[in-house]
């Protein structure tokens, strides 16, 4: 039901669960631990960083870490599947309208899946 991109984004966020700016993971370590192909994984890491849910630091001791622990699957969907740059504030009315439209599309898709 979910795209590989969204599945890999979820695995990356799960792998980064206990990270912070003092305890980062390299991109290689994240992708190895989550068993994600390098080419696709690097692009997803970049999208997640541009989307504001993870941070990256360059250099010898650099790597990636989660910006917040309060991230849900809908945030990932928004960042990875709608090609938007930043997750906006929940109070933003345009964001709420867009999320409603996406939610309705997902519900319509779910109606077509037989179980």
Question: What are the roles of these predicted feature ranges?
Answer:
Residues 6-10, 42, 74:
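Non-catalytic, well-ordered alpha-helical scaffold segments
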Residues 4-10, 14-36:
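N-terminal helix-turn-helix DNA-binding core of bacterial DNA-binding proteins
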Residues 67-115:
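Non-DNA-binding regulatory cores of transcription-related proteins
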Residues 51-66:
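Beta-hairpin "wing" of winged helix-turn-helix
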Residues 1-3, 101:
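Short amphipathic alpha-helical boundary/capping segments
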Residues 35-50:
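Short amphipathic alpha-helical interaction segments
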Residues 27-30, 59-62, 89-95:
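Short linear capping/connector segments at secondary-structure termini
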């Amino acid at each position: 039901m979910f795209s590989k991109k969204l599945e890999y984004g979820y695995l990356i966020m799960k792998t980064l669960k206990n990270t912070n700016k003092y305890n980062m993971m390299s991109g290689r370590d994240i992708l190895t631990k989550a068993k994600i192909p390098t080419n696709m994984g690097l692009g997803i890491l970049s999208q997640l960083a541009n989307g504001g849910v993870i941070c990256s630091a360059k250099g010898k001791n650099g790597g990636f870490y989660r910006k917040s622990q309060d991230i849900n699957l809908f945030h990932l969907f928004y960042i990875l599947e709608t090609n938007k740059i930043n997750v906006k504030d929940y109070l933003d009315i345009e964001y709420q309208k867009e999320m409603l439209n996406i939610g309705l599309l997902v519900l319509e898709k779910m109606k077509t899946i037989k179980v």
